[in-house]
Amino acid sequence: MYIEMIDETGQVSAQMQEQITELLQFAAEKIGKQNKEMAVTFVDNKRVHEVNLEYRGIDRPTDVVSLEYKPESEIVFDEEDLLDNPELAEMMEDFDAYIGELYISIDKAREQAEDYGHSYEREMGFLAVHGFLHINGYDHYTPEEEAEMFGLQEEILTAYGLTRE
């Protein structure tokens, strides 16, 4: 999985970015999405508030904003077209590869790590996996969805070694 890391704050270390990249690659393998691409942008509360307002109509900062990429129009090709034209098949794979982007507020991550009594690294990892699952179709609107999504994110974090301390 290719993950573009963007640090708009200048405060997220290369080591932290690498750890989150590895964690998301691990999560991608866990749910069978290894051949996908995404972006993670680290921002402050002011910027995440702007993103929330622009894309979700939410007038406040949140810890993570997940923007799932959905093409405006679906391009449909007959399977024979793809078999006859390897270049077209490759182009379609690339087209389908980008799944979305995350905006993680480092301010909220610090606040929540302190509030929950665990490390900043654990909180950043939690937010990354939580957002990643959202852009892959997981949600927590119903108790059943919540149990599935939260169970999976805890399973991923624990298997990776990011437990609550």
UniProtKB/Swiss-Prot annotation:
Highest rank taxon of the organism: Bacteria
Entry's Gene Ontology cellular component terms: cytoplasm
Cofactor details (free text): Binds 1 zinc ion.
Name used for this protein in its record: Endoribonuclease YbeY
InterPro entries on file: MetalPrtase_cat_dom_sf_prd, YbeY, YbeY_CS
HAMAP family per the UniProt record, alphabetical: Endoribonucl_YbeY
The species this protein was found in: Streptococcus suis (strain 98HAH33)
Record family assignment: Belongs to the endoribonuclease YbeY family.
Cofactors required: Zn(2+)
Primary enzyme class: hydrolase
Pfam family, any one: YbeY
Subcellular location: Cytoplasm
PANTHER family, A to Z: ENDORIBONUCLEASE YBEY, CHLOROPLASTIC (PTHR46986:SF1)
Binding locations of Zn(2+): H130, H134, H140
Gene for this chain: ybeY
Keywords from the UniProt entry: Cytoplasm, Endonuclease, Hydrolase, Metal-binding, Nuclease, Ribosome biogenesis, rRNA processing, Zinc
Biological process, per Gene Ontology: rRNA processing
GO MF annotations, alphabetized: metalloendopeptidase activity; RNA endonuclease activity; zinc ion binding
